[in-house]
Amino acid sequence: MESQRSFSSYRKRFGTPGGSPSVGVTSRHSTGRLSLHSSPRHLTSSPLTLSTSRLSLGGERLDFSADSLLKAQYRETRTNEKVEMMGLNDRFASYIEKVRFLEQQNKMLVAELNQLRGKEPSRLGDIYQEELRELRRQVDGLNAGKARLEIERDNLASDLGTLKQRLQDETALRQEAENNLNTFRQDVDEAALNRVQLERKIEALQDEINFLKKVHEEEMRELHEQLMAQQVHVDLDVSKPDLTAALKEIRAQFEAMANSNMQETEEWYRSKFADLTDAANRNGEALRQAKQEANDYRRQIQGLTCDLESLRGSNESLERQLREMEERFAIETAGYQDTVARLEDEIQMLKEEMARHLQEYQDLLNVKLALDIEIATYRKLLEGEESRITVPVQNFTNLQFRDTSMDTKLTPEAHVKRSIVVRTVETRDGEIIKESTTERKDLP
């Protein structure tokens, strides 16, 4: 007699002895249906074989060898089942410990994941946004400072251009003044040369006047001597009053001529000396004016040179400050860019770590689901084992010995009934959704 019921994905089969127990779990996430199967194994011992009691009817003796053989086989079966159950219990205990550990790890990961979902991303985002806003404010401030410095640089460049133009103008004026000064120096040199020449002429004229005076005195002396000699000769020879008058007249004429020549010479000398003195005075005044103008131009050139050096120093200082500020701004900008890149890398790393935690959490959920399925499977296996253990005892009680006494007639054969129960359980997400039982009864 054999009865069949509906089968599910998980099957518990009984086959020939010697099969080792093994359980396989297959998870299908697409449909949520879990397929559990087990390899064929024997949860019962070898079938009970009862040999007929050999009864010696002639001597009226009952042979209980069949009974002792049945008891030995049953004892061996129970021992094997006990050892097998102990191994299954140990494996089940280890699985339970593993499940507890994984559940604890799962709880820790869930708590960490909730913490990361609830706190860290938002706080990290706020920190990132705050730092980003701060960096943007600093960049805006630096841009404003840069614009201000560029305006100042443009103003300084304009002032520098104005000063350069002024310097060029002043340099042109200085060159013109130097040219005028050189011209005045030439004029002064010419005036000094003319003065020296005039002084030499004056000295020559004075020498000539002195010489003429000497010549005139010598002539007057000679004339006087001649007159005296003529007067003596006249006095000796002719002592007439008309000769004396003539001599006086001649003397008066010569004296008048000498006086006129003397006056003309003195007047010419005075006029020449006055002309030379006026020319020298005029040249001296022009020389003093030229020297004064040269000194004024020299003072102006010195003042402009000092202003130019001061402006050059200020320009160099401002250019140096501008270069330093540009370098500092470039360094700070590079630092801010590195900070932004580092923060972006940290955010990317946190995102990747979060994704990894999510993947680990999903894997742990899958493992937990598989373990829940295995636990449910082992629970059903244990329940099936408990129900199977009760079967041999019931079958053993069903053994009937027709002849139990010496004077009774023993049936030639003892009939043994065997019953095999196969329970099939179908689970989904740790819950039993379908359960079926197949029972087979074999008659020897």
Swiss-Prot record:
CC annotations in GO: cell projection; cytoplasm; intermediate filament; type III intermediate filament
Region (Linker 2): 265-268
Coil 2B as annotated region, ranges: 269-389
Biased composition (Low complexity): 33-47
Region ranges (Coil 1A): 85-116
PANTHER family linked to this entry: GLIAL FIBRILLARY ACIDIC PROTEIN (PTHR45652:SF9)
One GO-annotated biological process of the protein: regulation of chaperone-mediated autophagy
Boundaries of every IF rod domain copy: 81-389
Chain spans, region Coil 2A: 243-264
Residue numbers spanned by region Tail: 390-444
Region of interest (Coil 1B), ranges: 128-226
Keyword Amino-acid biosynthesis: no
Localization: Cytoplasm, Cytoskeleton
One GO molecular-function entry: structural constituent of cytoskeleton
Region (Head): 1-84
Keyword annotations: Coiled coil, Cytoplasm, Cytoskeleton, Intermediate filament
Residue segments, region Linker 1: 117-127
Location of region: Disordered: 1-47
Record-given protein name: Glial fibrillary acidic protein
KW Secreted (keyword) present: no
Pfam families cross-referenced by the UniProt entry: Filament, Filament_head
Assembly behavior: Forms homodimers.
